[in-house]
């Protein structure tokens, strides 16, 4: 269970016994648990939203997204903000990309991007029918599976913890989790069967635009995938087959 504990420690703020010393190899092994962590965090988000939904759907959505951000420690939002700042600042000066990406301060592009992503999540969560909340854990699991795929298939652009473990991720786990999540999506939320397309599209964009990935690119990909899938389900809720 060391791998699961490390995955929870790395991806969430949940109070679990920590793993004090670990290597990139340990982190790569723990990656097999990332989608399960997504299912766990997504279940808590869905429960928070469900608990308040009977009073006010907008309030429930806001509290659900707040729980979402708190549980993950805004880890992936930080990566999204860093990537947005780097892309914005290097629009006219490409050589500035990595310098801005490594800057710990959040700039205008990062703030605006975070605000828009959070607003989109709140709006989409508020639109979901109450019985469609079962799709939220699947969305978070798909997004974390994306980190395994991008880390495995894309070359690292710089040396960092998020980059070093990528090539060591066991490819078999990607296949296993893809089959599990496709089966669950087909049974509960058919629109989520498009998740592999979203994951592949983000990977293709990173390859074409940057030539590879960094840890921030993985975090940004989680946010993009979550937001895209949540919007997809919210806008196609008539296609849901979730049993009542």
Model-derived segments and spans:
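Hydrophobic alpha-helical transmembrane segments
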Residues: 1-73, 89-96, 103-244
């Amino acid at each position: 269970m060391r791998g699961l504990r490390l995955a929870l420690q790395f991806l969430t703020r949940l109070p679990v016994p920590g793993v004090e010393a670990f290597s990139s190899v340990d982190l790569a092994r723990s990656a097999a648990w990332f989608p399960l962590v997504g299912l766990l965090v997504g279940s808590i988000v869905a429960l928070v939203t469900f608990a308040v939904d009977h009073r006010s759907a907008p309030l429930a959505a806001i509290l659900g997204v707040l729980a979402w951000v708190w549980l993950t420690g805004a880890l992936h939002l930080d990566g999204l903000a860093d990537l947005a700042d780097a892309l914005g600042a290097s629009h006219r000066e490409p050589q500035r990309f990595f310098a801005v990406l490594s800057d710990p301060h959040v700039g205008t592009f990062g703030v605006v991007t975070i605000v828009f992503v959070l607003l989109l999540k709140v709006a989409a969560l508020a639109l979901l029918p109450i019985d469609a909340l079962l799709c939220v854990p699947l969305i978070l699991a798909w997004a974390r599976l994306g980190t395994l795929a991008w880390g495995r298939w894309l070359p690292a652009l710089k040396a960092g913890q998020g980059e070093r473990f990528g090539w060591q991720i066991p490819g078999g786990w990607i296949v296993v989790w893809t089959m599990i999540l496709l089966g669950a999506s087909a049974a509960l939320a058919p629109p989520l069967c498009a998740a592999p397309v979203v994951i592949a599209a983000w990977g293709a964009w990173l390859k074409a635009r940057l030539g590879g990935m960094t840890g921030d690119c993985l975090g940004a990909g989680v946010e993009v995938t979550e937001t895209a899938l949540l919007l997809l389900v919210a806008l196609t809720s008539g296609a849901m087959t979730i049993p009542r």
